[in-house]
């Protein structure tokens, strides 16, 4: 019998609405939206503390580390400053992601192989204090293997490219995802997925081999503008079986 896929709700774009006026408004209240997400069925909350602070702020990490009732997953760049924050606020998970200041959103996966020497001690330091580590990567066998060698607990596959493609190219990208998931599972890594997922693509991602977790944000926040955060998350929770 297939296990239920864990739903992580990314609330970055709740913070985007708050910050759009330069952070001068206290609404929408991030913790309130987190509580509504949990009530709707979120089993994890994900935030990306970017170096440019375009949405999530350090204060948000501080508040959620104290008051989030489900596991907290912190997405962050591999920098010494971010490692310091992670050590201080102790999220349940840290997901290492790439960052470019000019990008509108994360554009692709992390090159773990290229950054291995820099990230290895970071992974070690965080795991030593009980934080689990995932690597946000493209569905590449090489990147899966590098993630295994660096000691990660999980890989999160970047699904954005697959979401955007059509026809034969979409089918080819799906095969890449499936092959990478099989290899990750064989190596003992947990299999996660995220980026660009909406209700329709979440019906399909259910079929990814060995999938244990998805992290979804933008589409849920958009749907919530009409139907509320709790209902938005509840609808997604029903899809992920």
From Swiss-Prot:
- What organism does the record attribute this protein to? Bdellovibrio bacteriovorus (strain ATCC 15356 / DSM 50701 / NCIMB 9529 / HD100)
Reaction catalysed by this enzyme? 3-amino-2-oxopropyl phosphate + 1-deoxy-D-xylulose 5-phosphate = pyridoxine 5'-phosphate + phosphate + 2 H2O + H(+)
Q: Which residues bind 1-deoxy-D-xylulose 5-phosphate?
A: 12-13, 50, 55, 105
Q: Give the multimer and partner information.
A: Homooctamer; tetramer of dimers.
Task: Specify the enzyme's EC class, one word.
Answer: transferase
Q: In which pathway does it act?
A: Cofactor biosynthesis; pyridoxine 5'-phosphate biosynthesis; pyridoxine 5'-phosphate from D-erythrose 4-phosphate: step 5/5
| Active site feature | 48 (proton acceptor), 75 (proton acceptor), 195 (proton donor)
Which superkingdom?
A: Bacteria
Q: Which family does it belong to?
A: Belongs to the PNP synthase family.
What subcellular locations does the record give? Cytoplasm
Please name the GO terms of the biological process aspect recorded for this protein, alphabetically. pyridoxine biosynthetic process
Look up the EC number in the record and give it: 2.6.99.2
Sites where the protein binds 3-amino-2-oxopropyl phosphate: 10, 21, 196, 217-218
- Name it: Pyridoxine 5'-phosphate synthase
MF term (GO), any: pyridoxine 5'-phosphate synthase activity
Task: Outline what the protein does.
Answer: Catalyzes the complicated ring closure reaction between the two acyclic compounds 1-deoxy-D-xylulose-5-phosphate (DXP) and 3-amino-2-oxopropyl phosphate (1-amino-acetone-3-phosphate or AAP) to form pyridoxine 5'-phosphate (PNP) and inorganic phosphate.
Q: Where is this site: Transition state stabilizer?
A: 156
Q: What are the GO cellular component annotations?
A: cytosol
Q: What is its main location?
A: cytoplasm
Please provide the record's keywords in A-Z order. Cytoplasm, Pyridoxine biosynthesis, Transferase
